[in-house]
Amino acid sequence: MSEQIVTPESSTPVVSNNEAKINLLDLNRQQMREFFKNLGEKPFRADQVMKWMYHYCCDNFDEMTDINKVLRGKLKEVAEIRAPEVVEEQRSSDGTIKWAIAVGDQRVETVYIPEDDRATLCVSSQVGCALECKFCSTAQQGFNRNLRVSEIIGQVWRAAKIVGAAKVTGQRPITNVVMMGMGEPLLNLTNVVPAMEIMLDDFGFGLSKRRVTLSTSGVVPALDKLGDMIDVALAISLHAPNDAIRDEIVPINKKYNIETFLGAVRRYLEKSNANQGRVTIEYVMLDHVNDGTEHAHQLAELLKETPCKINLIPWNPFPGAPYGRSSNSRIDRFSKVLMSYGFTTIVRKTRGDDIDAACGQLAGDVIDRTKRTLRKRMQGEAIDIKAI
């Protein structure tokens, strides 16, 4: 019997916390146009309002000066623009910023990573995570629910507003978004896809599809479905050169093994233009677990039929974790083996680890409503794609 991952409580509500009003951040452009049509307005009004919402991070209808007063008044009666609030901010010595963002009575974490030529925002898709990857802090928090569209795109909106207001400090505007925060995005397709549509929309944030990246641990039915819904860059959390190791550290592999996963990746690449023909492989380096030169040779053989570049990620510790970080010398030897096979191989620079904002360290504040035994069934049995 298959398990349903998306529950009734986690599907996208049309109505916000204020039961009388629709949160416009929950609507992509098609839905926004339908909303205005139902108000008796022309569809172009949706474009106007979205431009104010996303180009100027405006949440006040009275400031939308190219909208007539009558319509502004009507909008105030039936709608609102409500992004989740930042309740805590931490700044790293390397410029990385981590925001704890309130979603109801819980928190998720969003990370802003500035670089010389760009700024990347790492966005969460769920409150917690059900997949229990052993090396990841988020997985140890359990799982509560999927984020709504407004809570996903609202992270980008809130970050853009903060960075935009701080232009005098020299902070770089957001150029890239990665769905690599808390949660497994493919277990929340219903809400993740509309949020990414807004990121790509010219009346939304207007990002290139090559600058919006979704990372997955391998929910194969949902990955096949994603390719028919939207085209964005794809990264996969592989982390092991064989099924024996991956079964242990990424338990969903017991249901969708590496061969099955990579087959779905290749099918996605056939449909995608955003990836320019290759996928990004994420590989966390765990000391004497998956980081030997024999593992590097196995990985190279495993990936020879999958066009890719490989990101080696030094593991970032968290309390109670059973692993150690690979030494620089082991990472260097591993990298050289991969490059000898002709793979583009990058050792990811750790950012924000002094504020627990680095890869695998995001935890938030999660009320775990998914029992551990249920989570194990979710990993060991078929996932109902109709529920995704």
UniProtKB/Swiss-Prot annotation:
[4Fe-4S] cluster binds at residues 129, 133, 136. It is an enzyme of class 2 (transferase). It comes from the Bacteria. The active site is at residues 109, 359. Keywords: 4Fe-4S, Cytoplasm, Disulfide bond, Iron, Iron-sulfur, Metal-binding, Methyltransferase, rRNA processing, S-adenosyl-L-methionine, Transferase, tRNA processing. GO terms for cellular component: cytoplasm. SUPFAM superfamilies: Radical SAM enzymes. Coiled coil: none annotated. GO terms for biological process: rRNA base methylation; tRNA methylation. S-adenosyl-L-methionine binds at residues 183-184, 215, 237-239, 316. GO terms for molecular function: 4 iron, 4 sulfur cluster binding; metal ion binding; rRNA (adenine(2503)-C2-)-methyltransferase activity; rRNA binding; tRNA (adenine(37)-C2)-methyltransferase activity; tRNA binding. Specifically methylates position 2 of adenine 2503 in 23S rRNA and position 2 of adenine 37 in tRNAs. m2A2503 modification seems to play a crucial role in the proofreading step occurring at the peptidyl transferase center and thus would serve to optimize ribosomal fidelity. This is Dual-specificity RNA methyltransferase RlmN.
